[in-house]
Amino acid sequence: MADVQAPTIGGAGRYAPSPSGDLHLGNLRTALLAWLFARASGRRFLLRVEDLDRVRPGAQQRQLADLRAIGLDWDGPVVCQSQRRTRYEAAITRLREAGLTYECYCTRREIQQAATAPHGPLGAYPGTCRDLSDADRAERRAQGRPAALRLRAERTDFEIVDQLHGRYRGPVDDVVLRRGDGLPAYNLAVVVDDAAQGVDQVVRGDDLLPSTPRQAYLATLLGLPVPAYAHVPLVLNKDGQRLAKRDGAVTLADQQRAGKSPEQVLALLTDSLGLPPRPPRELLADFDPARLPREPWILTDNGLLQPSECP
């Protein structure tokens, strides 16, 4: 079959891995889906490295090589979040000037021990530092507590529309904008980057669906467009947990050491999606998100991680 290129409609999709280790089969499957969603709809496909936090030496280079090995390409240079901190600080300044931020001195343990959130849903940040007096803040600074910066949310939930899940309403709380160590928080960085890069389609694992209303709400506060979302099922081990090294041959390099070629690994991924064993570009003509599996792909460890039926 000849390669098919959809008409360009503008906008972009993206894949945004963290260089904390090698990509496993679940990561590669999600990357393939993000690529197919974008290319089939005529969008550009961008690659962004979320390297604000833990970075393992050489991981980024291996990740890019693995994506190329299964036939994925991208438009423009790879963007690294570590080079974009001025953008995040500008967004924080905008929220601060609007009176929508406050300092938070809570430890993670203190937050977990809070039974309820008085101004938000169960499990949300309890608002301990929301209305501290100047004296309270001075006391906490004197104790040497590092201050994170939180959003002063003005609502408790927000609704988004997901291409696979439909309308989804989830909690919104006072998310962290800047961590206590000074690093921009994930929820802020991803919102700023998607808007700055013209990303109007976000395809990622459905474990991130619960955090999406927070991100969409934050985008609206910053006057930024909310992208279209599609949260896809994860790849799980036989116990229903996310893949890890202990599950066997979970990376492309592992599979190659076990005797499989990148093309065979790609065929494994496409088969799990109900797609034929073809190069990615040859899948575009017949790609239909409505026909994708809606359940996780369950793998068993027999040395090569062959797929098994979902329970």
Swiss-Prot record:
Cited InterPro entries: aa-tRNA-synth_I_CS, Glu-Q_tRNA(Asp)_Synthase, Glu/Gln-tRNA-synth, Glu/Gln-tRNA-synth_Ib_cat-dom, GluQ/Sye, Rossmann-like_a/b/a_fold
One MF annotation (Gene Ontology) recorded for this entry: ATP binding
Residues annotated for Zn(2+) binding in this entry: C104, C106, Y125, C129
Necessary cofactors: Zn(2+)
Positions of short motif 'KMSKS' region: 242-246
SUPFAM superfamilies registered for this protein in UniProt: Nucleotidylyl transferase
Positions with a binding annotation for L-glutamate: R14, Y15, A16, P17, S18, E50, Y186, R204
Motif 'HIGH' region, residue numbers: 17-27
Keywords: Aminoacyl-tRNA synthetase, ATP-binding, Ligase, Metal-binding, Nucleotide-binding, Zinc
Lineage: superkingdom: Bacteria
Free-text remark on how the cofactor is bound: Binds 1 zinc ion per subunit.
Keyword match Nucleotide-binding: yes
Role summary: Catalyzes the tRNA-independent activation of glutamate in presence of ATP and the subsequent transfer of glutamate onto a tRNA(Asp). Glutamate is transferred on the 2-amino-5-(4,5-dihydroxy-2-cyclopenten-1-yl) moiety of the queuosine in the wobble position of the QUC anticodon.
Identification of the protein by name: Glutamyl-Q tRNA(Asp) synthetase
Annotated organism of origin: Nocardia farcinica (strain IFM 10152)
Organism lineage: Bacteria, Bacillati, Actinomycetota, Actinomycetes, Mycobacteriales
